[in-house]
Amino acid sequence: MRWITRSHVHVDRVACPWLITRFVDSDAEFLFVPASQIEKVAADTGAIPFDAPGVELGHHENRCSFESIILKYGLKEPGLLRLAKIVHAADIAEDIDTDPIARGLEAIASGYSLRYPNDLENLDAQFEVYDALYAWCRLDVAKNKA
């Protein structure tokens, strides 16, 4: 399937494609366009919009888009839910200090945006970061259960 969001990816617009690819649609194709073109391009291509104003898989009821995707697709793995807390805090400015990892993730996202201005290249580079962070989240959850 095709998925569409705003260009110039940052925390949520990198985390969401990672989540979609790893847990929802392993053959996902991502399109990045200016916010003003999302509705038209989504209609023309059949792409599913995310992390854009007014879309189902966006910010709603104090959720970031990553959390909206988790909710929509019924994802419940504890490590993934731990990662969602980090992504939320890193993406929502007023919540940045609600998780000790958030400022680091936001800084990493900023650095990758400087190194990789092309959105697809940025995703390719950052997916490894999210794979590693997810592995850590699974370990963190396991340690805190004991």
Placement of each model-derived feature along the sequence:
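Extended, well-folded catalytic/binding cores that form a central cleft or groove in large enzyme
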Residues: 1-8, 18, 22-146
